[in-house]
């Protein structure tokens, strides 16, 4: 009789116990030719859905699975054959093939009172340094009992950082050096599975010598009630991959994913999603430079600026990536106040974002489905602004309609230039400006320059399917529209 046997010689004098282990690895119409312009005469009282300019009253603003290779027939020698399945198998001598799972280590790190001579196996035997904790963890969990300061170049890989207690000031404080996180998980779950309350930001990057790079496989968040990362004082955060996650349930005031002040944020890949904030669901920027070259900012919500909220002389540059499926009251994709926006990337997309007036038009203005600007400038040379929506509220008792302004862009007291091969298409508004709504006043002028691009397939339930321009108070010359190129067609 012949049975299967292993290639390698096995000593049958010994009872054999085989243990299979598994490693766990942790895991942002009408065509206008050059020189032409369609402007409605106020005296004639005519209006065209493609472009309208009028005066109006003021409006409310495992490791791989190990299998044992079995082959070759051999003579029966009284040995009992066994399989490579992960189960107990009997031998003729009564020994057992056992399958076992080895759990990864959990290490406690206390930067204040820990000692690297300790085992790190409990809070009372915590180690002191990050390097020792990483060494002992071997890809497992590191429970932080205090905020860890990083002030030198370091690359962290294949571990999970969790709070070791229910109240902490923060988790990582990066004051200098280049810090890279690869296949890192940082979350809010304490050893007993509850959430930690932070008095400061979970991750803080500060100072001009500090750079945090988030690479593939990294997951940061959620941190309910906190921004995930603050970057300040001329420091830099690079999101090259991974995820910065929110839970959509707990609202922070500023910047659910990243809060940037006097800093630089480069998004080259990865995802920022699921955040809820009053201002800036994905990214909040004040006096900062935000550069989006790739990645995705999606499924965030806020009152203003669900994707990006930029104020105070911030510069926002979009050369790639997607800002998609965000929901807000104003500027669901991008919101700018006293700031500048540059869009110049064929692959850049601002799409399927929605502004609404719910639950209250007082806060949720329903303006700028893709982009909202106030006292700001935008230069759009390429990219696509597509399928964004500005929803209007139902008319009040006096018949006035709130919101529904600018399906793609709403610009107040701002300067907007559209040129190149920009595509603004298939956007919709519930009141005015299916594609673009722009407004000036007696004291605050607005300027819309259309030098190129295509505005097509946009829809409005009210006026100005392509463009609606208005001077809401005073001198109508404070609202200028210059069309010297491009195509405006099939808007309805």
Residue ranges: model-predicted function:
Residues 31, 35-45, 59-60, 65-131:
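Right-handed parallel beta-helix/beta-solenoid
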Residues 139, 150-157, 172-190, 201-224, ...:
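Surface-exposed loop/turn motifs in large extracellular/passenger domains
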Residues 1-6, 41-43:
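N-terminal secretory signal peptides that target proteins for export/translocation
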Residues 107-111, 128-150, 155-164, 214:
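Glycine-rich repeat segments that build the extracellular carbohydrate-interaction surface of secreted
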Residues 7-28:
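Sec-dependent N-terminal signal peptides of Gram-positive bacterial secreted proteins and lipoproteins
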């Amino acid at each position: 009789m012949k049975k299967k046997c292993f290639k390698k010689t096995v000593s049958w004098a010994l009872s054999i116990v085989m243990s299979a282990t598994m490693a766990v690895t942790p895991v942002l119409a009408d065509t206008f030719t050059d020189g032409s312009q369609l402007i409605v005469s106020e005296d004639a009282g005519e209006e065209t859905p493609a472009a309208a300019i009028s005066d109006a009253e003021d409006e409310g603003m495992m490791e791989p699975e190990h299998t044992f290779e079995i082959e070759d027939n051999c003579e029966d020698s009284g040995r009992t054959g066994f399989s490579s399945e992960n189960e107990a198998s009997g031998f003729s001598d009564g020994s057992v093939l056992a399958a076992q799972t080895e759990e990864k280590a959990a290490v406690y790190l206390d930067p204040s009172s820990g000692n690297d001579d300790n085992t790190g196996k409990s809070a009372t035997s915590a180690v002191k340094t990050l390097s020792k904790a990483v060494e002992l963890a071997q890809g497992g969990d590191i429970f932080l009992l205090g905020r860890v300061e990083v002030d030198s170049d370091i690359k962290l890989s294949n571990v999970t950082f969790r709070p070791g207690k229910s109240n902490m000031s923060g988790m990582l404080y990066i004051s200098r050096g280049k810090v890279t996180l690869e296949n890192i998980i940082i979350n809010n779950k304490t050893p007993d599975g509850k959430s930690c309350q932070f008095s400061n930001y979970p991750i803080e990057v500060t100072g001009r010598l500090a750079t945090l790079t988030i690479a593939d496989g990294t997951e940061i968040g959620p941190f309910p009630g906190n921004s995930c990362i603050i970057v300040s004082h001329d420091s830099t955060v690079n999101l090259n991959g991974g995820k910065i996650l929110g839970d959509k349930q707990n609202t922070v005031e500023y910047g659910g994913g990243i809060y940037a002040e006097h800093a630089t944020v480069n998004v080259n890949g990865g995802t920022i999603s699921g955040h809820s904030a009053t201002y800036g669901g994905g990214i909040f920027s004040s006096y900062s430079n935000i550069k989006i070259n790739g990645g995705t900012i999606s499924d965030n919500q806020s009152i203003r600026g669900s994707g990006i909220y930029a104020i105070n002389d911030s510069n926002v540059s979009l050369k790639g990536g997607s800002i998609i499926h965000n929901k807000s009251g104003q500027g669901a994709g991008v919101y700018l106040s006293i700031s500048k926006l540059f869009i110049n990337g064929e692959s850049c997309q601002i799409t399927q974002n929605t502004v609404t007036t719910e639950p209250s038009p007082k806060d949720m203005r329903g303006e700028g489905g893709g982009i909202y600007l106030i006292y700001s400038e935008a230069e759009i040379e390429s990219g696509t602004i597509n399928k964004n929506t500005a929803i209007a509220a139902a008319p009040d008792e006096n018949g006035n309609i709130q919101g529904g302004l600018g399906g793609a862009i709403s610009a107040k007291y701002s300067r907007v230039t559209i040129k190149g091969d920009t595509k603004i298409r298939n956007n919709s508004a519930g009141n005015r400006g299916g594609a673009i709504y722009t407004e000036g006043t007696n004291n605050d002028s607005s300027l819309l320059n259309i030098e190129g691009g295509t505005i097509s397939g946009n829809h409005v339930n009210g006026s100005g399917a392509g463009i609606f321009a208005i001077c809401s108070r005073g001198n109508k010359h404070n609202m200028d529209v210059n069309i010297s190129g491009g195509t405006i067609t099939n808007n309805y």
